Amino acid sequence: MRKHLFPVLLLANTLWSCLFAQTPIVMDMVHHNPGEPFTNTWFNEPGNLVQYGFNAQVVNEFQSVHTAITYSSLDPRICPAGSKERLWIDSVATRIENKIEAIHKAGLEAYYFTDIIVLPKRLVEIYKNEICDATGRIDFTRPKTQEIHRIMLQEIFKRFPKLDGLVIRVGETYLQNTPYHTGNGPIPRNEKSWEHNSAYKTDGGEKIHSNLINLLREEVCIRQNKKIFYRTWDFRSEERRVGKECKIGRAHV
């Protein structure tokens, strides 16, 4: 009996691995310059990407899905109906919906490039004492900040249920295309230099990255069954900034 057990276990392991094997995702992303007119390129068209073997498109206009939600489940004062902020948000949301539809029509998966942290200015005004440090910087380590990001992710996929996932960037935060939002990177650093301020960033950023990745996995991969791609160059290694890129993927539960 024992001699037959290993082949059975091997077969079971192979079948289990095949069950959860993921098809490679070949993404195209036109990186528009923040604050400038959008790049006019043939590669903006989803149908053209299929000809080159892409199976996913990442939209990066620096007006991402987290700038196109109202946070109404948190506080209706943040983006009241009829306000200039609401009109802008609704306009961006409509454009995003149309882009997702066009991407799917071409047979591609749709992702949005998303900087962390970017929040409505009004939200930061209301919750400043709970989410900002003494310098006015939004502090990701604070419980309220993390709670707000969970609400943000929930509202994103409620507003855009057909979105396949997010490409998260940590390291730079561009606000030129978001007149009603503000933000900063979650990893504290010396703002006068790309080099990290070790006296301020006591854990090297690893703990904040870990907490953020786990939050994203729970809210996006597990709760929504969507994908996350996590991009960052905000680690300190041998006294220089280095880049990291990983796929959290879709959780199997």
Question: Predicted regions span which residues?
Answer:
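Bacterial Sec-dependent N-terminal signal peptides
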Residues: M1-Q22
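Aromatic-lined carbohydrate-binding surfaces of glycoside hydrolases
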Residues: Q22-R250
